Regions:
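Mid-to-C-terminal alpha-helical segments outside catalytic/metal-binding sites
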Residues: 1-16, 23-84, 112-120, 141-145, ...
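Catalytic pocket-lining loop regions of alpha/beta-barrel enzymes
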Residues: 5, 118, 145-304, 308
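Soluble or luminal CAZymes and related metallo-dependent hydrolases
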Residues: 65-69, 106-113, 138, 166, ...
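Aromatic-lined substrate-binding rim segments of carbohydrate-active enzymes
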Residues: 74, 78, 99-108, 167-182
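Short coil-to-beta-strand
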Residues: 79-89, 193-194
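Surface-exposed, active-site-proximal loop segments in enzymatic domains
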Residues: 90-106, 137, 202-205
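Alpha-helical scaffold segments that form or flank carboxylate-/histidine-based iron centers
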Residues: 129-134, 138, 238
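Short glycine-enriched loops at secondary-structure junctions
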Residues: 133, 189-195, 315-317
Length: 351
């Protein structure tokens, strides 16, 4: 069913899109330099070697839209009925950069750049903080600065940082800052690290088609099984793309996790206070970015509850107006649809 897409809540809810990307020229130039000088990993060469250099319509259009935080983006939001966009620096952020000082500088300048545009469009944009996990203490300070001084409402990290994962205790300053500020962490996909990407590259499966979800789902699962929510019970973590497949594997994940604990298969695998299912229902938010598919959305709502799912478009990578209509036309209750499109995001991001 086709209908006109309008902002303003004419269907009983406003549309808050929760995984929307922007970039800075400085960031993309750094990627291009790394691709050309051989310091980029294989995933970055595959993904940004395409987007930063290809003359194809898709690549040039996405770069143009990533760099725009002005009239074009607002027009696209108006044309698709998006009332509010939650914006974050596009993946992989500054995490691939080998020079930590450069990474911190680009992250800080991108946060200030975003803040200027949030101030220009305060009713349309919400900011998320970019950090450089290469320096966890600096990242914690930047989370506090952006929350207190810039009014940002969350933090995005693009999965692994040069093959390192957030379950390493050295990243705890980031989690302490998140809990102190009462803000969610959004773990956005990145291309898999060199240690796992080879068989994906051989079949063209390294990006959004499969590699993103497989690697990011594993990251969240690592955090859960290593006890992140036992240590930080008030922490909220968001993941996109209908949970990076975890809701669909949840029965077997829970079963085999418990079996491994009972068998003491791994010395480092310790019992958790709750089941993995419980943590997903209580501490994790799922967004529909890139997954405008009714069976998947309804299944995830059934398994995790309608308070755990939020709408996202994944602009500019998947700017498809009919996918907004798909969400509007979901065969769920009006109350569940309002949670999906508006009030869950308002709760999680404290809007």
């Amino acid at each position: 069913m086709s209908h006109e897409l309008k902002t303003g809540g004419d269907r009983g809810y406003k549309r808050i899109a929760t995984e929307e990307a922007f970039a800075t020229r400085e960031q993309i130039d750094a990627y291009l330099r790394m691709v050309r000088d051989g310091t980029a990993d294989k995933g970055m060469v595959s993904l940004w070697g395409f987007y930063a250099t290809s003359p194809s319509e898709r690549a040039t259009q996405i770069i143009d839209r990533l760099l725009d935080l002005g009239e074009q983006r607002i027009r696209h939001m108006d044309e698709t009925g998006i009332d509010v966009a939650v914006l974050a620096l596009t993946a992989p952020g500054v995490q691939p950069l080998l020079d930590v000082a450069e990474a911190k500088g680009i992250a800080q300048r991108s946060n200030d750049h975003l803040a200027e545009h949030v101030a220009r469009y305060p009713d349309r944009y919400v900011g998320m903080t970019a950090v450089a996990p290469q320096d966890p203490e600096w990242s914690a300070a930047e989370i506090r600065r952006c929350g207190r001084d810039l009014g940002f409402k969350g933090v995005q990290i693009a999965s692994h940082t040069q093959g390192e994962y957030l379950d390493d205790p050295k990243f705890d300053p980031i989690f302490r800052a998140l809990v102190d500020m009462g803000q969610p962490l959004y773990i956005h996909p990145s291309t898999p690290p060199d240690s796992m990407i080879a068989p994906m590259l051989e079949a063209g499966l390294d990006g959004a088609i499969f590699g993103f979800g497989g690697e990011t789902g594993m990251h969240l699962l690592r955090l859960i099984t290593k006890g992140i929510f036992d240590r930080y019970p008030d922490l909220t973590i968001c993941v996109g793309h209908m949970g990076e497949a975890l809701p669909f594997w949840l029965y077997r994940i829970d079963f085999m996790h418990q079996a491994g604990i009972r068998a003491q298969r791994h010395d480092f695998l310790k019992p958790l206070k709750k089941t993995i299912h419980d943590y997903l229902r209580e501490n994790v938010m799922i967004t529909t970015s890139g997954m405008a598919w009714e069976p998947a959305i309804k299944f995830t709502m059934e398994v995790l509850g309608d308070e755990r799912v939020m709408y996202a478009m994944d602009y500019p990578y998947q700017y498809i107006p009919d996918e907004v209509r798909t969400h509007d036309n979901l065969s769920i209750t009006d109350a569940a649809k309002r949670k999906l499109m508006q009030t869950n995001a308002e709760r999680v991001f404290n809007l």
